[in-house]
A protein has these predicted regions:
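Residue-level detector of solvent-exposed, low-hydrophobicity positions
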Residues: 81, 149, 292-295, 301
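Short C-terminal domain-edge/linker segments immediately following a structured domain
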Residues: 80-82, 90-93, 147, 224, ...
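Short beta-strand-to-turn element immediately C-terminal to the catalytic PLP-Schiff-base lysine
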Residues: 191-192, 288-290
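Intrinsically disordered, low-complexity regions enriched in acidic/Ser/Thr/Pro/Gln residues
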Residues: 2-204, 208
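Phosphate/diphosphate-binding glycine-rich loops and adjacent basic-rich segments that engage nucleotide
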Residues: 128-133, 295-301
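Feature captures the catalytic cores and cofactor-binding loops of soluble hydro-lyases/lyases
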Residues: 210-288, 296-300
Length: 301
């Protein structure tokens, strides 16, 4: 059993977060099939350069709706930062299209995360190995793609009902979205997974790339202290190896998509015991992996 902290041990200071979303759409003139000029909303797309303790890591092309959560989720899903407790601040500045993430070690002791004993070499090694993924906009996964799969353990006792799958699809269909207004975005939703089947959307994020949307949800889960073991993850995009691995890292055992899947996504989901359901449209779905969790309820009419 881990020792309890001393009664007078100081609490971890709260993470300082800016709140600087960008407008998600702009309006431009387009000419329709009748030759009429029509004001038309289009999705935003902005560069956002991520710095960790003053070191530039990556420039993300993003809608800009949740930049702080996106930065945190990126660091989480790339396994660059182990815990949100390592971080002191996340500050977005759209004047220079950047987000600066500051570690507690730098804020407290003047020592960057890159200078901590054992961390610098580990991070340099991880950042030196890249896999360009199949995401629209080409996402990148640092480190060996399969390196840490053996350490991931999804919860065994979780079930998901057919009614919950239908409920998620209906909730997403009815949700107000940027896609309905402007198109050109992918959406991801974190949902509850009640045995009653009456699922609820906890968080819904859209971005110009599905890898950004899943990272933003991962960051929000960190900020809010949300556990993934009793949740369902929904995406409008295809179920690739990157999507499966990121959901597994968040501890989410059930993954839904209205789209299809890739061979490596299928293989990794099987290996992890994840329940992966694709081609979800209306009352149709295809259960690909994790049938041990799935409970049919006969709601197909």
């Amino acid at each position: 059993m881990a020792p309890r902290p001393a009664p007078n041990a100081p609490a971890v200071p709260e993470l300082v977060l800016s709140h600087h979303p960008r407008p998600v759409t702009t309006t431009v003139d387009a000419v329709n099939e009748r030759g009429e000029t029509v004001p038309t909303p289009i999705a935003g797309e902005h560069p956002l350069t991520l710095y960790l303790d003053k070191r530039e890591l990556v420039t993300l092309m993003t809608l800009g709706a949740a930049p702080e959560a996106l930065a945190l989720g990126y660091l989480r899903n790339q396994r660059i930062v182990r815990s949100i407790d390592e971080l002191a601040a996340v500050q977005v500045d759209w004047d220079v299209d950047s987000v600066a993430v500051t570690s507690r070690s730098l804020a407290r002791d003047g020592v960057t995360i890159w200078e901590l004993a054992g961390r610098g070499d580990e991070l340099d090694q991880r950042l030196g190995r890249r896999t360009v993924t199949t995401g629209c906009g080409q996402g990148t996964v640092f480190g060996g793609l399969m390196d840490e799969l053996e350490a991931i353990r999804l919860p065994d006792g979780v079930q998901v009902t057919e009614a919950a799958v239908y409920s998620v699809m209906e909730q997403v269909r009815r949700h107000e979205s940027i896609y309905k207004v402007a198109g050109a975005v992918h959406g991801c939703a974190l949902c509850t997974n009640p045995l009653s089947g009456d699922a609820r959307i906890v968080n819904f994020v859209e971005d110009v790339g599905r890898h950004n949307a899943v990272d933003a949800i991962a960051g929000s889960m960190w900020i809010e202290g949300v556990d993934g073991h009793d949740k369902i993850f929904y995406t409008t995009g295809r179920l690739t190896s990157e999507m499966v691995i990121k959901c597994a890292q968040m501890g989410i055992p059930v993954l839904l998509s209205r789209s299809g899947l890739t061979g490596m996504g299928h293989a990794i989901a099987q290996r992890l015991g994840m329940t992966m359901i694709g081609r979800c449209q209306g009352r149709h779905y295809l259960l690909f992996t994790g049938a041990q969790r799935f409970v049919r309820t006969g709601l197909t009419s």
